[in-house]
Amino acid sequence: MIEIDALTKQYGSHAVLDGIDLSVAAGEIAAIVGPSGAGKSTLARCINLLEQPTRGTIRVAGENLTELGRSDLRRARRAIGTVFQSAGLLSRLTAADNVALPLRYLDIPDQERHRRVHSLLDRVGMLHRASYYPSQLSGGQRQRIGLARGLVLEPKVLLADEPTSGLDPQTTASILELLAGLRDELNVAVVLITHEMDVVRSVADTVAQLDHGRIIESGPVAEVVRGSDSPLSRALLPTPPGRSLTAAGVWQLRYDRADVPETWLTSVSR
């Protein structure tokens, strides 16, 4: 659904992104991780074309967005929804008006605008808070509104830039559950930028590690975990699984943390 090929972003002679290749299918959540300064924020701005790449291509549903002129690009960018770290809601607008804002800019008819806003607020569990202002909402509630706004133009790709940063564990879990549900229901490709490995373990299908502007390791999460003893594998599983021989040819796999999903143990033990 989104294909990034040889993406490079330079400021002067300094390459902040250097030959990024990334493909995310419809219905897939791809996590991008990396230390501060690795280029994650620049990659996010290039994906939604707030920054123009120096070289390389970004294709959404087969259309090369990097070749488009200004007017065509404005249209094509509707295919990419964005959820920001702190929701980015306008304080003087209600929850419903924040969600409706992109539709107003496009002069979407009132009836269709009301239908989309009502449907999305209901889907994210915030219909009963439609008339509330951001200051009246909790951090998790604001992020739910941000998710609804990111989806209101019915995008093919959702860019979620640190959507759980600063949220408590319970709220984080609820936002990730909602994100996964929306991914399944709407069949969108999700690019999830995060520094939290718990988030990757909980919801991502694939993961790519960015360092000094390059992807140094990537793959399906389960394969990365059971692959080589790499920094990314160790970060995803801080304490490696312990194995003890209990009988000839029979091995027992144990893991000493309670928060590891049962499906992970099954995948790692194959």
Predicted regions and their residues:
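Conserved signature/switch motifs of ABC ATPase nucleotide-binding domains
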Residues: 132-135, 152-153
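Conserved ABC ATPase "signature" region
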Residues: 63-64, 100, 104, 111-128
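Catalytic Walker B motif of ABC-type/P-loop ATPase nucleotide-binding domains
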Residues: 158-161
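Helix-to-loop junction immediately C-terminal to a conserved catalytic motif
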Residues: 48
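ABC ATPase "signature
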Residues: 218-219, 227
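ABC ATPase NBD coupling module
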Residues: 65-81, 105-110, 224-228
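The feature captures the beta-strand-to-loop junction immediately N-terminal to the Walker
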Residues: 33-35
